[in-house]
């Protein structure tokens, strides 16, 4: 993983008024802290932070926070906030990391391929959206994926089957299911009796299509047809 450089200026003032002045100047307040680092109040460019969040590793990127006084901190994004209406970044937290010490992070997880069981009518259930792992900061993968093509009805994929890069260890138990192909649920009596969306309720005649001839007086209504499952 490449380390991303992010410039910052030291921030002396705090509070809503100071934060508003920062934002008007094109900056947002941020704070950097760690186990061996006292909280450092800084200001950063929201555009620069968006570039970090939009990179391959996103929130898991390793950042070199260069403060104007010559101090440089190796950090990762711990959290960030958006304005509820404008959806613009308004604040960020950074946590200090050391390149020779492992970190615990959540990695985006995805399934690829169409399972055999889905072809025959089953449903793929992906249990996790992210996978917790432990590794050195520069070893953090951008994503984890599994090929589920061979999964049949009732088959599951366990955490023990994950193929992770060297030096990366999942924090899930080996027998933890991360994806499974379930048989389709059978509709109960009430669900079968319930009309489909857009269908006329029982006893109600459907409106004729535009231009269709009206049924002859006294003619029997057409028999209902069940939807094919």
Swiss-Prot record:
- Name the CDD domains for this protein: Ribosomal_L25_TL5_CTC (cd00495)
Annotated spans, Disordered: 1-21, 182-229
GO terms under biological process = translation
Which residues fall in a coiled-coil region?
none
Where is there biased composition of kind Low complexity? Answer: 195-222
InterPro entries with a match to the protein in the record: Rbsml_bL25/Gln-tRNA_synth_N, Ribosomal_bL25/Gln-tRNA_synth, Ribosomal_bL25_b-dom, Ribosomal_bL25_C, Ribosomal_bL25_long, Ribosomal_L25_dom, Ribosomal_uL5_bac-type
**A molecular function (GO) term:** structural constituent of ribosome
Q: Which GO terms describe its cellular component?
A: cytosolic large ribosomal subunit
- Record-stated family: Belongs to the bacterial ribosomal protein bL25 family. CTC subfamily.
Give the protein's recorded name: Large ribosomal subunit protein bL25
Q: Which source organism?
A: Sorangium cellulosum (strain So ce56)
**What's the source species' lineage?**
Bacteria, Pseudomonadati, Myxococcota, Polyangia, Polyangiales
- Its encoding gene is what? rplY
